[in-house]
Regions:
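N-terminal secretory signal peptides that target proteins for export/translocation
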Residues: 1-2
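Active-site-surrounding "flap" and adjacent substrate/cofactor-binding loops of secreted or lumenal enzymes
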Residues: 51-74, 80-94
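Primarily extracytoplasmic ectodomains and periplasmic/lumenal surface modules that are beta-strand-rich
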Residues: 40-41, 74-75, 118-123, 517-518, ...
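Solvent-exposed helix-loop boundary motif
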Residues: 33, 41, 67-68, 75
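Bacterial N-terminal signal peptides
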Residues: 6-16
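Long, well-ordered mid-to-C-terminal structural blocks that present hydrophobic/aromatic surfaces
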Residues: 437, 507-564, 568-569
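Extended surface/linker regions that mediate inter-domain or inter-protein docking
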Residues: 81, 85-93, 99-505, 547-769, ...
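Mature N-terminal segment immediately following signal peptide/propeptide cleavage
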Residues: 20-47, 56-62, 125
Length: 793
């Protein structure tokens, strides 16, 4: 198939190129290489892709192939003439229309990458990687913006329409049927068009301060989409569009290749002029040869919001920067933050199971082309676009992956088919054409939505995942663990097998994600006044900059050092506190029990053009959540969001950490008994201890109040009612329902026995000398259960 594609592309490239062919072709060190001599071939010189690029380049006067992707004038003798225009053959065909500094830019990618990777640019432009529609909806909901209530998704980063209908462009027949039904059932999460996030005037914001949420959105939250180059900060350097992922950038942003025209001292450049992709796309850099897309590439964006990228690496931001480094300073900031190492996801860890090689998984090893590029539809949230579930590879204790029905573990309250999903012998055409292909053995496994996993195969009694790193991993199958009785511990057997409801109702990571980054209280000040120099506050507006595009595919912030366009106002942020342990549990959009994390617990303060406060420590309200829940209390719009945190551990949460933990159940840390005085100002001075009156006449408020916050930030249930929003995207997401909490909660179990310790006669009969170990205690309880059961005969 690759040979067929190359042949077709060469025919296309050579058609209509008579003018270019009859001119004298540059040779030696002429053309692009007269300046860029030494630059790395974008792919290995003997790869089909590089052969193709150079063949097209030769037909357009550039044997090095630069013009194939970049355009430009290969006859130019200086930067002004060389970096202008494009060979007529390419302009008249489907190639570059002008010089493209970054051919990956999504705004011109249909004329560069899209020459071969047809329709990818269309798909990516409508994917969450570019629209960020879900992030926008969720964040603005926390400000109390009415237009995004009731799960509506009206806005994206830019105006965009789904012009080819809602049947996916790509995917298997099963996938297309599955998604068509899903779109029909959940139309709000698959909008047919988006308009750009509005930018209210400062006057409008002063009259309605919650509209400052739009400033916050445009200046802070929207820098991580592929339509722009992003922030010039350590760890955030990247390209645009396709280059965001497929061109390597080091965290320091230095070029370490051999092109003499690219500065080695200026930050913000690619690491090397290479494409990183799948296993076959190997990159040799210094002493390291690697393949695949490193996790840190993904983290140039996935370090805020749900923080799943840095969490996967085991990192959680913290404010201290300890320990000190060799120069006596604090650790350097990464993504503008400093980090504490907790524990990386088991799939990321270098040490693996005994039967597997050393090495962790890359994001792309699990996530599919649809997850990352989209399928041509517009998605309103992550659960709409991502098609994979843990059970797709691991199965359950009762069923191997291929025995599960499609839709397993993302039920969305629908009945699942009774038929097995099976295996498939067929790859997606896109995978077969461009990715590394692997022997299907007995067949490729399928995703929950029916697409083939091109890198995961059934091989006899085993499932093998082929990682883009070059490693092949045997995947543990839960049913095989049960058949072999090879459980690592009794806890695992009980949690995954004995308690059937766990399989039916829980996400795997409800237990295995034993830590989650929890940033409680997002205190945001948006200031439209003047700074200390008397200048009006303003900051980079990522959407304003991304909306200005030139013929070269560049946006306003693309040239290094420009920092894009600015809009009025400046955002200042802080928080209440951070935690990682024992995350709260709730229900996600699929209807399963999942960890929750503070999604955006916005408490906003807004200052007008005269530096006067027009809104102080305000909370939005979720009238839509109140209506869905049918409760009297109106939940605050601050969000505890359902999340797949990407922090899975081999040792899962203990039974007690959920069943004997008020926080996990939603009642707050230690049952919500702490931090209960937010609704009142706290003054710390000389106090009349009889009355609580402040004695000095001149005193200040130590801790200003948050008037509507009558609970601890981690509390989502108070007096039987939900206190804050739990997810904004799907009708099913909410706190654990009362019946489930009642079935789970086992706090106070110790009293069942130990309240009788003062009954000397009884306790003498059941106690033993010394102290029981934990294991002995469990055995004692087991004996009691069996004795009780025997008494029922």
């Amino acid at each position: 198939m690759n040979k067929l594609i190359i042949t077709i592309l060469l025919l296309v490239a050579w058609s209509g190129l008579q003018a270019a062919v009859t001119t004298t072709a540059p040779s030696g060190k002429t053309g692009c290489l007269s300046c860029h001599d030494g630059i790395e071939d974008i792919r290995a010189s003997d790869s089909p892709m590089m052969i193709q690029i150079k063949a097209i380049g030769t037909g357009n006067g550039d044997p090095a192939g630069c013009v194939t992707c970049h355009g430009g004038n290969p006859k130019g003798t200086d930067v002004e003439t060389a970096h202008k225009g494009s060979p007529e053959g390419l302009k008249n065909g489907n190639g570059p229309q002008d010089f493209y500094p970054d051919p990956g830019s999504v705004w011109i990618a249909d004329r560069s990458c899209g020459q071969c990777h047809i329709d990818y640019a269309y798909r990516v432009e409508r994917s969450l990687m570019n629209t960020e529609a879900g992030k926008i909806q969720g964040n603005l909901h926390t400000w109390g913006i009415a237009e995004v209530q009731n799960h509506k998704v009206p806005w994206g980063n830019y105006d965009v329409k789904d012009t080819d209908g809602q049947v996916p462009q790509v995917g298997s027949a099963e996938y297309k049927e599955y998604m068509t039904a899903m779109i029909a059932a959940h139309g709000d999460q698959f909008p047919t068009e988006l308009t750009q996030v509005p930018q209210p005037s400062v006057e409008e914001i002063e009259n309605d301060p919650k509209l400052a949420g739009f400033t916050y959105q445009r200046q802070q939250c929207q820098r991580c989409h592929v339509g722009i180059k992003g922030r010039e900060k350590r760890g955030d350097y990247r390209g645009m569009g396709c280059s965001s992922c497929h061109i390597p950038y080091g965290n320091e942003g230095y070029y370490e290749g051999k092109d003499p025209t690219i500065s080695k001292d200026q930050q913000g450049h690619m690491l090397t002029h290479k494409i990183q992709a799948t296993r076959k796309s190997k990159i040799k850099h210094g002493d390291v040869e690697y393949s695949g897309i490193p996790v840190e590439t993904c983290n140039s964006c996935h370090n805020r919001g749900k923080r799943i990228g840095v969490t996967y690496q085991g990192l959680m931001e913290f404010p201290y920067g300890s320990p000190y480094n060799a120069q006596g300073g604090k650790q350097p900031k990464l993504h503008t933050k400093q980090y504490l190492f907790i524990s990386d996801d088991l799939h990321h860890q270098i040490d693996s199971r005994p039967e597997n090689p050393k090495g962790g998984l890359l994001c792309q090893d699990c996530h599919t082309t649809v997850d990352m590029h989209g399928d041509g539809n517009i998605f309103g949230t992550t659960l709409a676009q991502v098609e994979i579930e843990c059970q797709d590879c691991h199965g359950t204790t009762e069923q191997f992956p291929w025995e599960l029905p499609l839709g397993y573990s993302e039920e969305f309250a629908k009945d699942l088919p009774q038929t097995e999903r099976g295996l498939t012998n067929d790859l997606l055409p896109e995978t077969a054409a461009f990715a590394t292909t692997y022997d299907k053995r007995e067949g490729y496994l399928k995703t929950a939505r029916g697409n083939p996993f091109g890198n995961v195969v059934k091989d006899g009694t085993k499932v093998v995942m082929h990682s883009a790193t070059g490693n092949d991993f045997e995947v543990p199958l839960l049913k095989q663990l049960k058949l072999d009785d090879s459980w690592k511990s009794p806890d695992a057997m009980v949690a995954m097998n004995a308690v059937a409801k766990h399989n039916e109702s829980l996400e795997c990571y409800a237990c295995h994600a034993s830590w989650v980054p929890q940033c409680y209280g997002c205190h945001v000040q948006v200031n439209y006044g003047k700074d200390k120099d008397g200048k009006p506050y303003q900051d980079t507006d990522w959407l304003a900059g991304g909306s200005i595009r030139d013929e070269h595919g560049q946006t306003a912030e693309s040239p290094l050092g420009t920092h894009g366009l600015k809009s009025p106002g400046k955002v200042f942020e802080t928080r209440s506190y951070l935690r990682w342990e024992e995350p709260v549990l709730g229900i996600n959009g699929e209807g399963r029990v999942t960890p929750l994390m503070p999604g955006c617990q916005i408490v906003y303060t807004v200052m007008d053009r005269n530096n006067k406060v027009v809104a102080l420590n305000q909370l939005g309200k979720s009238l839509d959540e109140q209506q869905e829940l049918g409760q009297e209390r109106v939940p605050d719009a601050i969000d505890m969001a359902p999340v797949q945190p990407h922090s899975a551990q081999r040792k899962a949460r203990t039974c007690e950490s959920c069943h004997n933990n008020p926080k996990a159940l939603g009642y707050g840390i230690s049952g919500g008994v702490f931090q209960t005085r937010y609704p009142v100002d706290i003054v710390e001075d000389l106090i009349d201890q009889k009355t609580g009156q402040v004695i000095p006449g001149r005193h200040v408020i130590q801790i200003p109040k948050i008037a509507d916050l009558d609970y601890d930030w981690s509390t989502i249930i108070k007096d039987g009612q939900q206190t804050q929003t739990v997810g904004t995207h799907w009708p099913l997401s909410r706190a654990l329902p009362q019946a489930m909490r009642d079935g789970m909660e086992r706090t106070g179990l110790c009293l069942g026995c130990h309240r009788e310790m003062t009954n000397a006669e009884l306790w003498a009969k059941v106690s033993t000398p010394g102290t029981l170990t934990d294991a002995e205690h469990i055995e004692m309880l087991n004996k009691l259960l069996k004795t009780y059961a025997a008494s029922k005969k």
